[in-house]
Amino acid sequence: LRLVGSEMCIRDSNYTIQTYKKNETIYCEGETPSHLMCLISGKVKIFKDGVGGRSQIIRMIKPREYFAYRAYFAKQDFVTAAAAFEPSVVCLIPMSAITTLVAQNNDLAMFFIRQLSIDLGISDERTVNLTQKHIRGRLAESLMFLKESYGLEEDGSTLSIYLSREDLANLSNMTTSNAIRTLSQFAAERLITIDGRKIKIIEEEKLKKISKIG
């Protein structure tokens, strides 16, 4: 995006940099949004607490992605919460500055419309996947989702994010015990290998097939 003159001044004079420790809360459900956030480094989860205290992970944020602005544009309080998966650095820009920029810059307005549209499409697809697929399909879909979101390590097969079994369960809309059991089944079938929290994808096409058929 090309921001010129006063627009650059507004952005550059207003941003702050905040660091978050692993598992530290970035914002809470019910809070009033005030800043656009951009993840500079680290990994962030957007989640919602559900029945019985079990969380559902809604989205995963990777570096250079923007978040925490939908509720502001909708004139709502946050309906989700955000926390750092690992030590993370976030850039915060006041939404008051963003609304000024949007009013002056059509490209920036279209950028946010496009991002909101992409996020809505991803949300719609995951809602269907997590409600209609069986446990094996949901876990396989989550593993592919993590690969697409964060990529692989230098070996070309190990996921570049190490989730706890609880987080993987929350991402897959299942209990932790079901996540552990299904991971073990995938490992026994040589679809993956497991080393602590490290998951190596061995048979990606078979996992994609399991995800597709649900």
Q: Could you tell me what each predicted segment is?
A:
Residues 59-121:
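Cyclic-nucleotide recognition modules
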Residues 2-3, 60, 84, 92, ...:
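Short aromatic/basic micro-patch
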Residues 1-5, 9-10:
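Single conserved hydrophobic/aromatic residue that forms the stacking wall/gate
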Residues 103-173:
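Polybasic "coupling" helices that flank or enter modular domains
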Residues 24-86:
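Cyclic nucleotide-binding regulatory domains
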Residues 148-214:
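Phosphate-/nucleic-acid-contacting segments
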